[in-house]
């Protein structure tokens, strides 16, 4: 026997609904060729050529300096030059950490004779000596390095323009200008006494110059400020607009306007909050194994205040480029295992789709000049305990990444009710301390953020920043641009899928063994599999089509397709009465296994494991009257489907596809060579024994490699250890033994009807492995 349902799915999944395929390909092609690059990006609509509308004819020269600002005392940002322009003599600059560094600068006017002056600086009265016999201004730096010292002059700047500039680098070191602007020895000097968090006191009007424009700052020191520090209009324009406009963090600026359309620049401060979500799926068996710990997309809605107005925001977080790890302590059913778990690493990205109820998102269809700035976000993982039936629970703990803003694009965000045109903020991941580990295992000192508990003790993660964009919107503010994809969206699909998975797994305990074996012997084709779901034939056909579409992307279908076309054709046959087409290229298919004949245990185990993982596919190429693992898998699916309370056409195809991939992960296959049997498992175990006495003999790797290409593969429903245990405790005849080795359904049913505990326990263990 070989399950007919999987054969039909393998065959028909490649030819199902050709019209749907043509439609999909046509849609993709149409999307690629009709999008024309223009001034505006678009989220859904095709671009349209719009005029610029009414535009201003004046050319505006923006001021070079940012300022002037009034005197200030604060922890000014680092990596900027602060150009002071004092109008009077005296202290113009001071800074201290109150521990190891005190500094202030005193402006001495030209032609000042040597004299002593008393100044109040940094809550201290100080007596200093000043002297400037020249005709230029002199900025003198006074420094001390302990509270008991007296201030001494260190460096000075002679300048004709009453300008001095200061800068604090990332380490906190103070730099300013030394020398003289008239003698050509003007230079930048640095005091290597870090004061990273100290308050800087600027006692004069000052300008801010970016660090990248240091040369411009030097020119100002040497040649003075420009003659005019206001906006200059080169060509005459209307007096009504002759006012300097400074972009505010939150405002709407009309760039141009026509009768129907206008361009509006939206500037917004935003607070982005997001919550990671995960899928934690426990595998079948005794409760010691987990099949998947992965990230999944998650929606989050919140409110915050922007300029005194409450903003309702909605975010969707998703990840890309995660690293997938696994861990397995051994082959026993009681050995702890995590088949796959996701970790955010350096190659990973986090996407946060953001929408709020402000005017900026009301007409987000045609967009240009999109820019954004966001701060970093630190994400630290928490604890997750793996609840084992017996023994101490392993705990996954720790892990951290730092998310750095990497770009912004347009996106569409799906909620439970509508789809929203949003902004997608992309964050690049960088690993950070602490590392993560799983207590009681060898998993330790790994870096990244695992998906087990990515939120730690945080309710949400938050990033603050701003964005700016220009939209083409209707001139009438009451009109909202229709969005083509504003339709109801079923975002509860994932939740329903999880609920059906749980219900599907809970039904394993309610399956009668005799009923299961009888069902496994039936020719379960697609119609009989789905006919019990709906009352009409058309509904069953629709259901089967949906399952085939989903099954086409399953790992089993991909494995069949990747081996050879011959195997795919053979697996696709839906005839049970006649023999399947032989695989002419079988030898080439299994060359990678048959070539490995080294007799060492490690290589034999590797060879056996590699063969066992491919035997499921090869099993479809042969016709045998025994029960296969896929027969049991299909029977369990059919039994559980008939017990489900609610069946959804969108959800059940996913469940059936997952069942084909995840049901009975621990399988054993055997090859019979006369009086000798070779048996291998997907867990790396291998046996060779005699059919007469079940005595274990040496595993002949060379002979096994030959049998791989020529002999039929049999599912070891009753594996070697179970048969040996049955023979030792109950005794079985030679005929019963041979039928058991061939997985004869009649013999299995007879032992089950006799309530044989060994056989019943084996079948029950297989059913318990039928979990998703």
Swiss-Prot record:
The keyword Coiled coil applies. The record marks 232-233, 242-243 as: Cleavage. Residues 247-478 are annotated as: Spike body and stalk (antigen domain). Residues 483-510 form a coiled coil. The keyword Coiled coil applies. The record marks 245-246 as: Probable cleavage. GO terms for biological process: permeabilization of host organelle membrane involved in viral entry into host cell; virion attachment to host cell. One of its GO terms (cellular component) is host cell rough endoplasmic reticulum. Belongs to the rotavirus VP4 family. This is Outer capsid protein VP4.
């Amino acid at each position: 026997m070989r399950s007919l349902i999987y054969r039909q799915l393998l065959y028909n999944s490649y030819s199902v609904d050709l019209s749907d395929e043509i439609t999909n390909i046509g849609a993709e092609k149409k999307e690629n060729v009709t999008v024309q690059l223009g001034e505006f990006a678009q989220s859904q609509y095709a671009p349209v050529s719009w005029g610029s509308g009414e535009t201003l004819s004046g050319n505006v020269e923006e001021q070079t300096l940012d300022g002037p600002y009034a005197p200030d005392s604060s922890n000014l940002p680092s990596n900027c030059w602060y150009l002071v322009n004092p109008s009077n003599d005296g202290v113009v600059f001071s800074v201290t950490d109150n521990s190891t560094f005190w500094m202030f600068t005193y402006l001495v006017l030209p032609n000042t004779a040597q004299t002593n002056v008393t100044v109040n600086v940094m809550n201290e009265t100080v007596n200093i000596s000043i002297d400037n016999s020249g005709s230029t201004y002199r900025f003198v730096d006074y420094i001390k390095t302990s509270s008991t010292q007296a201030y001494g002059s260190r460096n000075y700047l002679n300048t004709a323009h009453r300008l001095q500039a200061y800068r604090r680098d990332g380490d906190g070191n103070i730099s300013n200008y030394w020398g003289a602007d008239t003698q050509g020895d003007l230079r930048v000097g640095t005091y290597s006494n870090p004061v990273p968090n100290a308050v800087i006191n600027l006692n004069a009007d000052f300008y801010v110059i970016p660090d990248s424009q240091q040369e411009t700052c030097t020119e100002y020191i040497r040649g003075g400020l420009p003659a005019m520090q206001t906006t200059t209009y080169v060509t005459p324009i209307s007096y009504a607009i002759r006012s300097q406009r400074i972009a505010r963090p939150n405002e709407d600026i009309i760039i141009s306007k026509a009768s129907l359309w206008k361009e509006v620049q939206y500037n917004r401060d935003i607070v982005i909050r997001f919550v990671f979500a995960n899928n934690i799926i426990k595998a079948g068996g005794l409760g010691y194994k987990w099949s998947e710990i992965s990230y999944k997309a998650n929606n989050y809605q919140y409110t915050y205040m922007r300029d005194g107005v409450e903003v309702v925001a909605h975010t969707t977080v998703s990840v890309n480029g995660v690293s997938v790890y696994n861990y397995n302590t051994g082959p026993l059913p009681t050995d702890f295992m995590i088949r796959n778990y996701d970790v955010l690493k350096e190659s990973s990205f986090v996407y946060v789709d953001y929408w709020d109820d402000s005017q900026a998102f009301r007409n987000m269809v045609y967009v240009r000049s999109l820019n954004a700035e966001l701060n970093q976000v630190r994400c630290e993982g928490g604890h997750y305990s793996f609840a084992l039936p017996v023994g101490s629970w392993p705990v996954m703990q720790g892990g951290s990444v730092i998310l750095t803003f990497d770009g912004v694009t347009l996106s569409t965000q799906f909620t439970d009710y509508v789809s929203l045109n949003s902004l997608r903020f992309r964050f690049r991941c960088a690993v950070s301390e602490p590392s993560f580990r799983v207590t009681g295992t060898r998993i330790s000192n790994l870096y990244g953020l695992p998906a087990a508990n990515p939120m730690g003790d945080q309710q949400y993660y938050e990033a603050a920043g701003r964005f700016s964009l220009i939209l083409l919107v209707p001139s009438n503010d009451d009109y909202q641009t229709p969005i083509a994809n504003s339709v109801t969206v079923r975002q509860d699909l994932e939740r329903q899928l999880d609920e059906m998975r749980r219900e599907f797994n809970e039904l394993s305990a309610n399956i009668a063994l005799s009923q299961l074996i009888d069902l496994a012997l039936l020719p379960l084709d697609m119609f009989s599999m789905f006919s019990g779901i709906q009352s009409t034939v058309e509904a069953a056909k629709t259901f089967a089509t949906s399952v085939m579409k989903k099954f086409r992307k399953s790992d089993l279908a991909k494995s069949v397709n990747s081996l050879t076309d011959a195997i795919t054709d053979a697996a696709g046959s839906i005839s049970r009465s006649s023999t399947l087409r032989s695989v002419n290229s079988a030898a080439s298919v299994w060359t990678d296994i048959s070539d490995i004949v080294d007799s060492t245990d490690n290589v034999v185990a590797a060879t056996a494991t590699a063969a066992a993982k491919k035997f499921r596919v090869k099993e479809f190429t042969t016709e045998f009257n025994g029960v296969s693992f896929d027969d049991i898998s299909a029977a369990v699916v059919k039994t559980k489907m008939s017990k489900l309370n609610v069946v959804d056409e969108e959800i059940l195809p996913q469940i059936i596809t997952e069942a084909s991939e995840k049901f009975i992960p621990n399988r054993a296959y055997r090859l019979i060579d006369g009086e000798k049997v070779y048996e291998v498992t997907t867990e790396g175990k291998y046996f060779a024994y005699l059919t007469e006495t079940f005595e274990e003999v040496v595993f002949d790797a060379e002979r096994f490699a030959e049998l791989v290409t020529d002999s039929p593969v049999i599912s070891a429903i009753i594996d070697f250890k179970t048969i040996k245990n049955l023979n030792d405790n109950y005794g079985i005849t030679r005929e019963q033994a041979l039928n058991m080795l061939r997985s004869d359904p009649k013999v299995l049913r007879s032992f089950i009807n006799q309530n044989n505990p060994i056989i019943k326990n084996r079948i029950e263990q297989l059913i318990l492995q039928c979990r998703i």
